[in-house]
Amino acid sequence: MFDIKAWAEYVVEWAAKDPYGFLTTVILALTPLFLASAVLSWKLAKMIEAREKEQKKKQKRQENIAKAKRLKKD
């Protein structure tokens, strides 16, 4: 089975012996995740903006319908 304690010791030893190599490896490993997070955040922001715009449009339409019904009633 995989020994987590031995692996953690190896990683700590590697980070102590070669900090620049360790940081480079960590940054290279995490960069795609950061990029994916940025893209997904941007898409979510666009979806939220579109939903809010659509809700405002529907609200305006409902107000205009109600206004037209009031004028027609009078």
Swiss-Prot record:
Compositionally skewed regions (Basic and acidic residues) per UniProt: 55-66
Bilayer topology term: Single-pass membrane protein
Coiled coil: 42-74
Highest taxon listed in the record's lineage: Eukaryota
Spans traversing the lipid bilayer: 20-40
Protein's cellular compartments: Membrane
A GO cellular component entry from the record: membrane
Alphabetic keyword roster: Coiled coil, Membrane, Transmembrane, Transmembrane helix
Region (Disordered): 55-74
Membrane found in the keyword field: yes
Similarity comment text for this entry: Belongs to the SMIM15 family.
Protein known as: Small integral membrane protein 15
Gene: SMIM15
